[in-house]
């Protein structure tokens, strides 16, 4: 399922220069292929889930469509405040 997700994002990135991938400390594996193909639109930000939400909010405000990926429990619990303040209060489109 992860492979299909990343392959789909890469396929979308090839068609749309505004699509950005933002991840948080995910293993290299098959993501290296995406990083090699579109390095300027591939960000792996380390263990900083709160930061990837803030980064993605800023990218969305500039007209990009960020796809955020990290471990689900960290995304929902560690950065709840950023999701509410950075995304929901200003109504940003984020994938």
Role assignments for model-derived ranges:
Residues 1-95:
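Thiamine diphosphate
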């Amino acid at each position: 399922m992860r492979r299909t997700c990343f392959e789909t994002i890469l396929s979308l990135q090839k068609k749309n220069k505004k699509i950005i991938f933002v991840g948080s400390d995910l293993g290299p594996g098959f993501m290296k292929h995406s990083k090699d193909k579109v390095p300027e639109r591939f960000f792996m930000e380390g263990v900083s889930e709160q930061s990837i939400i803030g980064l993605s909010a800023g990218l969305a405000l500039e007209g990009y469509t960020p796809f955020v990926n990290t471990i689900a429990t960290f995304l929902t619990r560690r950065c709840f405040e950023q999701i509410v303040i950075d995304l929901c209060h200003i109504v940003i489109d984020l994938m």
